[in-house]
Amino acid sequence: MAQFTESMDVPDMGRRQFMNLLAFGTVTGVALGALYPLVKYFIPPSGGAVGGGTTAKDKLGNNVKVSKFLESHNAGDRVLVQGLKGDPTYIVVESKEAIRDYGINAVCTHLGCVVPWNAAENKFKCPCHGSQYDETGKVIRGPAPLSLALCHATVQDDNIVLTPWTETDFRTGEKPWWV
């Protein structure tokens, strides 16, 4: 029978501890690396505005400058920007000098399609299932069960800042469903 020599077959404790720590560190690093994007997904992005608001962004991701915005749009225009939580939001041009004090979330309340503005008919029409909303985003024809969500739109330092709308919905006189 072969003779067993302890010194050749069993590594010393220092080496064993080192290998255990190396394995633990590798597994921990991989686990943290995999969890980081998941945790980051649940943390809302910062819009750079004060008071919980988000600065409106154009399709390229740049801040919308009100002075240039009003020069290039006419009264009554509804223009898509990136708004609260990254949702597409319409900014309503009131005149060549001002925007309305609210923005309209462009996500249909039926199945989540982006609802385009139809200037010829003066209403929003969902391309997915035909829901229609008036110029303020109030539902006028289903299957959408609710009006489009609102947000406050204010001008600060030539930027459009969007903040959550928590007051009574002026279109329905009811508490907002999106709060």
Swiss-Prot record:
Keyword DNA damage attached: no
Major localization listed first in the record, in broad terms: membrane
Annotated Rieske domain residues: 61-162
Entry note: cofactor: Binds 1 [2Fe-2S] cluster per subunit.
Transmembrane segments: 21-43
Record's subcellular location: Cellular thylakoid membrane
Name of this chain's protein: Cytochrome b6-f complex iron-sulfur subunit
Organism whose genome encodes this protein: Mastigocladus laminosus
Classification of source organism: Bacteria, Bacillati, Cyanobacteriota, Cyanophyceae, Nostocales
